[in-house]
Design a protein with these regions (language model features):
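Intrinsic disorder at enzyme termini
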Residues: 1-8
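Residue-level signal for inorganic ion chemistry
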Residues: 9, 105, 187
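Short secondary-structure junction/hinge motifs that connect adjacent elements
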Residues: 27-48
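Internal helix-loop-helix
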Residues: 49-110, 114-120, 161-167
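A short, Trp-centered hydrophobic/proline-enriched beta-strand micro-motif
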Residues: 119-127, 171
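Active-site-adjacent elements of ketosynthase-type condensing enzymes
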Residues: 131-139
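A structural signal for short hydrophobic beta-strand segments in well-ordered beta-sheet cores
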Residues: 141-144
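A short core secondary-structure module
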Residues: 148-149, 153-189
Length: 191
């Protein structure tokens, strides 16, 4: 058994390495915890997308390249070797995007995935709450349907990138009578 990269994988490594050498900013971007830095990182997301590098494993129909796990690992190795900027949209790209691909409606996929891939929509996460921390079963913020809208009542904390994001996703208690690890709904909220 020969263990190593195939010729096409080696060629792929050269391709991403070359693109990164030409495009990674020579001066590090400001922190994305500031307005200026956030906008710089959003522009980087757009640049990645223009080179078709923003979502290497996503299906082509959602703005990706449709690559496999080995190619994704090659991409990640080269990305970090080049000291490329941190991904400001990692909450959307790595957490919400795959969830929508698996469980989202066609309408949700159409509305959110391409905008996520291009950097048009930056996402924050809304998991944690005071008194709940990382214990998702302890969530108390509620979401109840009233007409064609949901009324959300409660508080979230440590919402990564919420200060500058366009959208947030989070877990909310939609059935307070259920067992504590049930009755939760994932909601997408324009902020």
């Amino acid at each position: 058994m020969k263990i190593g990269f195939s010729d096409s994988q080696k060629k792929f490594r050269e391709e991403i390495r070359g693109w990164l050498e030409k495009n990674v900013p020579k001066i590090p971007l400001n922190s994305f915890d500031t307005q200026e830095g956030f906008e710089e990182h959003r522009e980087w997301e757009k640049k990645l997308n223009s080179g078709n590098w923003s979502m290497v494993t996503w299906p082509k129909q959602y703005g990706g390249r449709g690559l496999n796990l080995i190619e994704w690992l090659i991409f990640e190795e080269e990305y970090y070797r080049a000291k490329a900027p941190a991904r400001v949209n990692q909450n959307g790209v790595f957490l919400l995007g795959p969830t929508l691909m698996e469980y989202g409606s066609d309408k949700q996929k159409e509305k959110f995935l391409s905008a996520m891939a291009t950097g048009e929509h930056i996402w924050s996460q809304g998991w944690s709450e005071p008194g709940a921390g990382s214990d998702m079963a302890a969530i108390r913020t509620t979401a109840f349907k009233k007409g064609d809208k949901y009324i959300i009542n409660g508080q979230k904390t440590w919402s990564s990138r919420a200060a500058f994001a366009d959208w947030t996703f989070g877990l909310f208690r939609s059935n307070p009578e259920s067992e504590r690890h049930r009755g939760l709904s994932l909601s997408l909220i324009h902020i």
